[in-house]
């Protein structure tokens, strides 16, 4: 199992531009994400996120599960067919409970379309990815703008990532964002 640990912040385009100016070159990735759940929302009820994302056109399927330490369990693989992605993810170690939960099928529930500017940051005691995401979240017939900054631990200790993210938040006056893209897009679908 992979473990995801990240801190997210709401940002303005001007704040993102200032961060980009400070840190130099970023890699640009076009993201088109569809989030899936069961018709009775069994995954969301258990705080499980299931998605297929096209990253510069390449299909990547991911499942994220709650983790006791505040991070999330994460399994990911390149996979084109959403109908068979749960089985494929379980084959690489995702909880087999997912097969039972999704036995009745999965449906698309919401999505996101955005551009990610990503950069690896070397920290004392580890590395992190600094990501600037700008685009839209979609649910039902509604959409809202997306503009956020993510700092994700890639290796090393949580503390180094937390320290870097906090200093970034102070310097650029960023506001913590405690809800995932999925949860915010899901709310749009529910309000429709």
Regions found by a protein language model. Give the residues of each.
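Phosphate-end processing signature that detects enzymes handling 5′-triphosphorylated RNA
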Residues: 1-192
């Amino acid at each position: 199992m992979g473990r995801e640990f990240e801190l997210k912040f709401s940002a303005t385009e001007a704040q993102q531009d200032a961060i980009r100016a400070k840190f130099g070159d970023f890699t640009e990735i076009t993201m088109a994400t569809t989030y899936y759940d069961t018709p009775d929302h069994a995954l969301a009820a258990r705080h499980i996120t299931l998605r297929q994302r096209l990253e510069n056109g390449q299909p990547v399927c991911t499942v994220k599960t709650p983790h006791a330490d505040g991070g999330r369990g994460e399994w990911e693989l390149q996979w084109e067919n959403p109908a068979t992605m749960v089985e494929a993810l379980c084959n690489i170690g995702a909880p087999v409970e997912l097969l039972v939960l999704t036995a009745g099928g999965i449906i698309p529930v919401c999505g996101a379309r955005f551009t990610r500017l990503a950069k690896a940051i070397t920290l004392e005691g580890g590395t992190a990815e600094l990501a600037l995401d700008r685009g839209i979240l979609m649910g039902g017939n509604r959409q809202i703008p997306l503009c956020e900054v993510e700092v994700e631990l890639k290796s090393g200790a949580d503390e180094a990532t937390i320290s870097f993210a906090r200093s970034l938040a102070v310097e650029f006056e960023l506001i913590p964002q405690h809800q995932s893209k999925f949860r915010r897009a899901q709310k749009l679908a529910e309000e429709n």
